[in-house]
């Protein structure tokens, strides 16, 4: 009999999940191809490093910001970020703690939540990094991966939905205008919209 994972065990399941990472990387690659500028957030430094190594092929520039770097190194990385030309495609990979108050890079228009978070303030803070005026920015999109097979993360997702609704976000269709489906019991249309109705 298998047991339901909790705590660090639950995070380990998604942190070291190649299929899940492949899904995220495919979405990031499509995002860059569509001319968007994504930031991918994860809770773990090793996860950020692993994803950044595999994602660098998809953009002209990839910049990794993690809490493992000293202050001097982080300043150099921020300088590198600010030096990226508008004509260059860019992927920013970071640990969530580094995108707190004071971080400002208006070009970002797409957020990838590579590990689950909960708490209205955290969601508002992360999404707030995208809500900056920038020439040519038409909208902002959040990719939120629903780990519904793990009860802990399913509850966290429900909490995030409430936060998204509070700050005015809507359920999104894919970039080609079609509802995106997943090979699971619920696709994004039925699963998320059911939650959305529950919040009304």
Model feature map: region roles:
Residues 45-47, 70, 98-100, 116-120, ...:
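Conserved nucleotide-binding/hydrolysis micro-motifs of P-loop NTPases
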Residues 39, 49-50, 59-100, 122:
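Conserved helicase ATPase core of P-loop NTP-dependent helicases/translocases
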Residues 1-54:
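Conserved interdomain hinge at the start of the Helicase C-terminal
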Residues 3, 9, 134-199:
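C-terminal helicase lobe
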Residues 92-94, 100-116, 125, 141-144:
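A short beta-strand element within the Helicase C-terminal
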Residues 30-33, 56, 82-87, 103-105:
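Conserved catalytic network of the ASCE P-loop NTPase/AAA+ motor domain
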Residues 110, 117-142, 160-161:
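Conserved SF2 helicase motif VI
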